A protein has these predicted regions:
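RNA-binding accessory domains that recognize and position tRNA/RNA substrates
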Residues: 1-134
Length: 134
């Protein structure tokens, strides 16, 4: 899928559940991800989700520099890794996400291929230029 990036310091539950990221590999540039876990999926009386954009993860994968297995937040109900595993979404760590973001900014749209053995294992990403012309 297409590799995209997000420069927000927090809000990965909202970003991952945003339908606009459907099928894309989301690169998070903030250096530490997962340290506040994942909040519960709740809906307000008006029908709007409280901590997420929808009830499922739309991104096809998440790419982070450093994943924190330890999480601590008053509202967290599970770790990011547990949530991704439950939703069958691969997580990739050990990538220089800021350098990857520079490449994406300089070269534009890029497609990727991921190969992994288990959730949050250091792997290689093979980036190729998209056949789509601007």
């Amino acid at each position: 899928g297409e590799v995209v990036f997000n420069t927000a310091m927090m809000g990965y539950p909202e970003s991952l559940t945003d339908p606009s990221y459907a099928g894309q590999l989301m690169t998070l540039t903030y250096p530490l991800v997962g340290n506040y876990g994942v909040p519960p999926f709740t809906v307000e009386k008006n029908g709007i989700a409280t901590f997420m954009e929808s009830d499922k993860i739309y991104a096809s994968a998440i790419i982070v520099a450093d994943y924190s297995e330890q999480y601590c937040h008053w509202n967290a109900v599970e770790s990011l890794a547990d949530w991704l595993k439950r939703e069958h979404v691969p997580g990739i760590t050990g990538i220089d996400t800021r350098e990857l973001t520079k490449v994406l900014r300089e070269h534009g749209l890029m497609m990727s291929q991921t190969m992994y053995r288990k959730l949050f294992t250091k792997v290689s990403i093979s980036l190729t230029r998209s056949a789509v012309r601007r």
